[in-house]
C-alpha cells in the first residue's frame, strides 16, 4: 500500500502550503546543545535547503505559522524573546514580552494570536505584531475553534472557555464551564482529584466534553449543557460528518451531527506474525476512509504506524518503527509523511 522512500533524522515536521519543513539535531538525538538544523524537504525526501538555527540561549523551538519559532532566554540579563526564522533559516523578526514559547491561535490566512504571558497579534507575511496586554488566563491551552469561537482550557484543564475574536484586537470571553468540583474523582494514588477536560470534540454547534466522570453535550453558542452521559467519548477524527477513533483500544464511529454512536466494537488486538498482540492506539489522521494510528505493542515496547480501514474494520497496512510513539502523520499528494520525534519517514502510495 505504501513504499518507504526515505528516512531522515528529525525531531519535528510541519507541512505549510505543501512545503515540508523539518527540524533535526546534529547528533540525531532529541536534545539541545549539539546543533539544530532547519530543513526543507522535497516530496521524495531530498534536501531543498538547510540552515543552522542559533542555539545560544535557546529554550524552546518549534514549527508554527509556516516558520521556525525559537524562544530564547538570557537568564543573566533577565530577558526573554521569540525569534521567527524563514524556511531558509533567515531571521525575520524578534518579539519580546511573550515570556516563553507561545501557544498559536490561527485567525485565518497569515494572521495569528500568540499566547504567552501576554497576548500578541502576529501577521506571518508582513511580520507586524502588537502586544495586546497581559493574558488573563491561568495556564491556558488552546483546544481549537468552531462556530466562530476559540476554545481554551485553563487552570490545569479544569475549566473550558469559549472566546470571541475581536477582529485582531484580542479575545473576549463568551462563556466558561468549571469542572474542578462537579467532576471530582479518585486518582491513581487514592487522592481526590479535581475534574478536568480530558477529551474535547467540537462539531457544528456542539461541544462534547469528556472528563474522568462523564461526557457533556454543550451548546457552543451559549455554553448551556444539553445532555449528560455517564461515559466518556474519545477525541474523534472527523471525515464526512463521521468521527472515528481507535483510542484507547476499541473502534468507535459516531454521527457527529446527531450525536449517535454508530459503532462501538470490542477491544482490538494487532495481528502480527500470526498472533493477536495486545496493544494501545493513538489516533493521528483520517483520510479517504483510512484511520492512521500509532500502535504500541505492549509485549515488546515497540511502535508501529498502521492504517485501519474504517469500513472493513481491519488493518490494511503497517510499518515498524522504534521505541517512541508517533507524533504526527501528513498526506501531501500521494506521499505519506510521518514523524516520531526522532525520525521522519516519507512513503509513496502504490
Report residues per predicted region.
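An edge-strand/N-cap motif at the start of beta-rich repeat modules
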Residues: 1-46
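A short beta-strand motif characteristic of beta-propeller blades
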Residues: 1-6, 46-52, 89-96, 128-134, ...
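Repeated scaffold domains used in trafficking and secretory/extracellular systems
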Residues: 6-18, 52-66, 97-110, 134-149, ...
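Short beta-strand elements that form the blades of beta-propeller/WD-repeat-like
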Residues: 18-32, 66-76, 109-115, 120, ...
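Structural motif
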Residues: 28-39, 77-83, 117-123, 156-163, ...
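Short loop/turn segments that connect beta-strands within beta-propeller blades
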Residues: 42-44, 86-89, 123-127, 165-169, ...
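Solenoidal tandem-repeat scaffolds enriched in leucines and small polar residues
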Residues: 106-216
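Intrinsically disordered, low-complexity segments enriched in Gly and acidic/Ser/Thr residues
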Residues: 229-230, 246-322
Amino acid at each position: 500500500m505504501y513504499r518507504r522512500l526515505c528516512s531522515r533524522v528529525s525531531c519535528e515536521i510541519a507541512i505549510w502550503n505543501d512545503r515540508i519543513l523539518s527540524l533535526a539535531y546534529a547528533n540525531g538525538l532529541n536534545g539541545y546543545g549539539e546543533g539544530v538544523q532547519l530543513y526543507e524537504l522535497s516530496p521524495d525526501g531530498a534536501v531543498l535547503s538547510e540552515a543552522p538555527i542559533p542555539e545560544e540561549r535557546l529554550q524552546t523551538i518549534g514549527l508554527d505559522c509556516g516558520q521556525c519559532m525559537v524562544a530564547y532566554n538570557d537568564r543573566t540579563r533577565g530577558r526573554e524573546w521569540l525569534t521567527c526564522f524563514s524556511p531558509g533559516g533567515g531571521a525575520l523578526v524578534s518579539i519580546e514580552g511573550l515570556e516563553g514559547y507561545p501557544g498559536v491561535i490561527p485567525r485565518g490566512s497569515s494572521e495569528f494570536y500568540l499566547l504567552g504571558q501576554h497576548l500578541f497579534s502576529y501577521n506571518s507575511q508582513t511580520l507586524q505584531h502588537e502586544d495586546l496586554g497581559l493574558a488573563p488566563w491561568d495556564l491556558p491551552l488552546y483546544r481549537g475553534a468552531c462556530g466562530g469561537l476559540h476554545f481554551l482550557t485553563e487552570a490545569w484543564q479544569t475549566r473550558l472557555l469559549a472566546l470571541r475574536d475581536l477582529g485582531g484586537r484580542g479575545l473576549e470571553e463568551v462563556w466558561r464551564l468549571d469542572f474542578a468540583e462537579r467532576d471530582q474523582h479518585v486518582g491513581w494514588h487514592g487522592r481526590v482529584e479535581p475534574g478536568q477536560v480530558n477529551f474535547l470534540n467540537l462539531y457544528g454547534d456542539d461541544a462534547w466534553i469528556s472528563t474522568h466522570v462523564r461526557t457533556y453535550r454543550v451548546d457552543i453558542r451559549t455554553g448551556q449543557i444539553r445532555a449528560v452521559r455517564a461515559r466518556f467519548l474519545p477525541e474523534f477524527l472527523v471525515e464526512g460528518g463521521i468521527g472515528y477513533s481507535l483510542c484507547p483500544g476499541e473502534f468507535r464511529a459516531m454521527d457527529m451531527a446527531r450525536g449517535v454512536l454508530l459503532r462501538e466494537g470490542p477491544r482490538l488486538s494487532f495481528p502480527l506474525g500470526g498472533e493477536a498482540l495486545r496493544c494501545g492506539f493513538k489516533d493521528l489522521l483520517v483520510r479517504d476512509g483510512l484511520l492512521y494510528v500509532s500502535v504500541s505493542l505492549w509485549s515488546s515496547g515497540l511502535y508501529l504506524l498502521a492504517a485501519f480501514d474504517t469500513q472493513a474494520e481491519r488493518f490494511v497496512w503497517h510499518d515498524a518503527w522504534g521505541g517512541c510513539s508517533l507524533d504526527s502523520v501528513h498526506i501531501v499528494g500521494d506521499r505519506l509523511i510521518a514523524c516520531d520525534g526522532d525520525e521522519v519517514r516519507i512513503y509513496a502510495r502504490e
